[in-house]
Structure formats: C-alpha cells, structure tokens
Amino acid sequence: VCIVESEIHMVQALEDIKKAGCNALCVYLGNFGPEISETLLAKHFDGPKMFVAAAEETSKDGGLVQGRGDAYCGMLNASYNLKLRNVKAYIPEYPVGNAEECADMIHEFVPIAKAIYALDHLKIISFGPRPLNFLACNAPIQQLYNLNVEIEENSELDLFEAFNNHAGDARIPDVVKDMEAELGAGNKKPEILEKLAQYEITLLDWIEDHKGYREFVAIAGKCWPAFQTQFGFVPCYVNSRLTKMGIPVSCEVDIYGALSEFIGTVVSNDAVTLLDINNTVTPDIYEEDIKGKFDYTLKDTFMGFHCGNTCLLYTSDAADD
C-alpha cells in the first residue's frame, strides 16, 4: 500500500512493490490526479495491472463540499493517459465504487491476472506433426508469440527415442503402483501399465529438461495413427494424469487446444478437459432427454467429444478414463 503523488513517489512505490514480490498490481485512485505518476507506475510495473477508483460516499454534512472522495474524473483522465502511453491495463466495466465494490472488482481481476502471468511464463511443448487432414489443428505460432507464450516443436520420432531410452527406468515400479491404486476396478489392462509408466516418466523428464526459463508447461501430443502400433499403447490415461498434475495435454498436436486447457486450469484452479463440437444429437435422444425439459430445438444441440484426457476426478467410473 503506497500513496503516489509524484514521479519520485512512483519510483519509490515501484521499488516497494518489487521488494514485496508482487506479480500483479491494482492502482486505486482515491481522488482526482495525479494521472502522470499513477500511469507511469503501471507502465514500469512488469506484470498484469488494473485500475479502480473511489466513488462519492455521501452528500450529507458537506460531503460534496469539504469531504470529496471521488475519482470519477481521475479515472477518465487515467484511462486516456494509459492509451497515450500504450499501457495495457484492465479497467472494469464500471470501475468506480465504494470500498466493498472495489474489493469485489479486485477479486474479479485475480483470475485475469493469473492468466496473464501464467501465459507470460508458459512454454508449450509439441510432438508432431499433426495427423493428415486435421487442418483444424493448424496453429501458426505468431499468435503464441503475440501472447508471450514460448513453444518448442518436436518430432514424434524424438519422443519415441526418449521413450525407448527410459526402458527399465528404476522409477517405473512406483509409478505402476500409483496407477494401480488410482484405477482400482478400472484397471482392465494391467499388462500395459509398465509401458504407460515409462511413457509418463519420459514426458515428465522431457518437461524438466526442456522447459528452460519458463515456469509452466502444456503439451500438445500425438496419439494416432502410428502411435499405438509403435509405442504399444494409447497415451490417453497418461495424458489425463499429467492434466491432473496441472500440465494440460491436448491430442492431435492441437496447440491452441493445449493453450485453452492451460488457461482454463489457471483460471479455475482445477484440472480441465477439452470438449470438441463433434456430432449431431439423434432425434430419439432429443425427444427422450431434451424436448420439453430444456428450451432447445434439435438444431440447437450437438454432442461433444474428446478422446480421453479427462482425469479420474471427473469420471463416474475409472473404466471410463
């Protein structure tokens, strides 16, 4: 908490903010001005920032004469100054309020700030190329760079080599035990757990060795057409386990999908799954389960699908994963 009334105060406040380890900033305008120093604070702060402002509290007892406490015009001037400086800041739809209202605005800013910070510290690791004819999974990397997201594109062959190099890894038995405990009655193919554990360790080691200076990682991986025949399994279960660890994994080298999953994870503080618009709803299902219960026509509905990255937390039966 600091009062900024001059450019010198701004520098001092910025140092205090850095010492405190803050990675997001809310600039609260308690009265009109000073727009230059307050917007300079936002300019020089390296992280997500928002602006809110005080509203008048009462007209009684000279509240609008000697008791002014409003920053309505100050917010207007500050927003103009931010634009002049090309400073991007979050301003709520109605950014002026009393203490409780401003606190609510700050609370609403938290997931936004988390998403911005996380994207600034994200690397997407892909293993491709995407399957033939899956043009929907095309992902020009320019837009990732525009979001300050790093990407490392790898060959599926590189991943296969790393997987083979992890054969007999001493950590495999412990991972198998963890999988057995997690799957319970859903452990329908115990004979492949060793390979799945080997693959999970391969990915985690790859992340550790390749994340570089980035704090977070998401993966866009491949699961077909040659994956199953060459690796000897499908990776869905491992992908779901990584997703539960906070490392979202998308299929079909869907890089933008991995980015979407990552944002969802950060904003929700929870594991996410990616649901594709896949196919139409059959007339009989519509008649039995939707018509009369919801205000939708058949043409308003669709079936969503994804091929297995939903973690066990969100399945009714382990066999569904």
Residue ranges and their predicted role:
Residues 218-225, 276-291:
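A glycine-rich phosphate-binding loop feature that marks nucleotide/adenosyl-phosphate handling sites
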Residues 111-138, 289-307:
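Conserved anion/nucleotide-ligand pocket segment
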Residues 1-66, 71-76, 93-108, 113, ...:
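Metallocofactor- and cofactor-centric catalytic cores in central/energy metabolism, strongly enriched
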Residues 77-95:
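Conserved thiamine diphosphate
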Residues 184-258, 264-267:
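Long, internal scaffold/assembly segments composed of regular secondary structure
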Residues 314-321:
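Conserved small/polar residues in nucleotide/adenosyl-binding loops
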Residues 255, 259-262, 267-286:
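Catalytic phosphate/nucleotide-handling subdomain of diverse soluble enzymes
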